[in-house]
């Protein structure tokens, strides 16, 4: 069955619109944080995997970093291990860390690897412990109430922050035409494992790789102003101002701060995109309009 003239022209227009972007980004590295609603449902999962495979086929170097908070919570519940959060971070004792490693480094990581491979890619899964990819240190959290004379330092267990990234491991995989899929688990100097926020890991990997783009898939349509309008293009100075005036607050603040730090650290652009949209990654990279918020270091975005 042949296409109608209108359908054929629509396909041709899409391809020609994508061409300059393909030419511009060939050979460039793009770090994509996969999580949230984008991980739920077979259709969105396959949409994401095909986007990643197509990026590789047209000469880009996608690097996937994934989360897995709901899956961790589900297994902890089955094992009757209590989940506790402080400042949005999971308190991670030794028993919880074992579960985190099983879920992130085992189940979720291999599911994503399999998903990409089934859609025609060549993915290899690893955690930050492999090849000492992610060197981490213990994250300390402070807590203060008006009644306290000095802030209290809280121990939240095996929760870490990125100290350094061994980019040679990632470069080796990229140069061998593999797609790295990375679980956000770091390793300390003493060999201890650390649970690290996946957005922060993605941002730091993008920074150390000097990536062209950092893309964070979220459950919202992008960064919004106080009237609920999506802000499609922002400079780092504009983002700083939106944080200062309270437009960016709450749960969105850590994600935006991660994107902001990456761009200030040398990543060309960061993108907050709606993971609930089919082929959101391709639409953001290869179309003029995009489907989210672009943050750059340019005076005007």
Swiss-Prot record:
Lineage top rank: taxon: Bacteria
GO BP term (any one): L-arginine biosynthetic process
Site (Transition state stabilizer): 33, 255
Enzyme class: transferase
Pfam families in alphabetical order: AA_kinase (PF00696)
E.C. designation(s): 2.7.2.8
Species in which this protein is naturally found: Cellvibrio japonicus (strain Ueda107)
InterPro entries: AceGlu_kinase-like_sf (IPR036393), AcgluKinase_fam (IPR004662), ArgB (IPR037528), Asp/Glu/Uridylate_kinase (IPR001048), Glu/AcGlu_kinase (IPR001057), NAGK-C (IPR041727)
Principal location: cytoplasm
Protein's name according to its UniProt entry: Acetylglutamate kinase
Summary of the function given for this chain in its UniProt record: Catalyzes the ATP-dependent phosphorylation of N-acetyl-L-glutamate.
Residues that coordinate or bind substrate: 68-69, 90, 195
NCBIfam families: argB
Keywords: Amino-acid biosynthesis, Arginine biosynthesis, ATP-binding, Cytoplasm, Kinase, Nucleotide-binding, Transferase
Gene Ontology cellular-component terms listed: cytoplasm
Family recorded in the similarity comment: Belongs to the acetylglutamate kinase family. ArgB subfamily.
GO molecular function: acetylglutamate kinase activity; ATP binding
Subcellular localization, as worded in the UniProt entry: Cytoplasm
Pathway assigned to this chain's UniProt record: Amino-acid biosynthesis; L-arginine biosynthesis; N(2)-acetyl-L-ornithine from L-glutamate: step 2/4
Catalytic activity: N-acetyl-L-glutamate + ATP = N-acetyl-L-glutamyl 5-phosphate + ADP
């Amino acid at each position: 069955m042949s296409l109608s003239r209108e359908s054929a022209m629509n396909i041709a227009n899409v391809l020609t619109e994508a061409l300059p972007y393909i030419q511009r980004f060939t050979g460039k590295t793009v770090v994509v944080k996969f999580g949230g609603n984008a991980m739920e449902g077979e259709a969105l999962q396959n949409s994401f995997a095909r986007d990643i495979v197509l990026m590789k086929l047209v000469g880009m170097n996608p690097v996937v970093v994934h989360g897995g908070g709901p899956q961790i919570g589900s297994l902890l519940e089955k094992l009757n291990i209590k989940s506790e959060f402080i400042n949005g971070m999971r308190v991670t004792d030794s028993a919880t860390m074992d579960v985190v490693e099983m879920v992130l480094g085992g189940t979720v990581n291999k599911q994503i690897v399999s998903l990409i491979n089934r859609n025609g890619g060549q993915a290899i899964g690893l955690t930050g412990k492999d090849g000492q990819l992610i060197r981490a240190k213990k994250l300390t959290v402070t807590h203060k109430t008006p009644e306290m004379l000095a802030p209290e330092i809280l121990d939240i267990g095996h929760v870490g922050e990125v100290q350094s990234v061994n980019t040679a491991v990632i470069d080796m995989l990229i140069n061998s035409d593999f797609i790295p899929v990375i679980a956000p688990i770091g390793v300390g100097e003493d060999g201890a494992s650390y649970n690290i926020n996946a957005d922060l890991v993605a941002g730091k990997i993008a920074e150390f790789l000097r990536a062209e783009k950092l893309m964070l898939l979220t459950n919202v349509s992008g960064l919004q102003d106080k009237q609920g309008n999506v802000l499609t293009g922002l400079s780092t100075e504009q983002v700083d101002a939106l944080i200062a005036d309270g437009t960016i607050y709450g749960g969105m603040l850590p994600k935006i701060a991660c994107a902001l730090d990456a761009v200030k650290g040398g990543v060309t652009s960061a993108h907050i995109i709606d993971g609930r949209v089919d082929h959101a990654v391709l639409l953001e990279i290869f179309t003029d309009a995009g489907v989210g918020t672009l943050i750059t270091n340019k005076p005007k975005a």
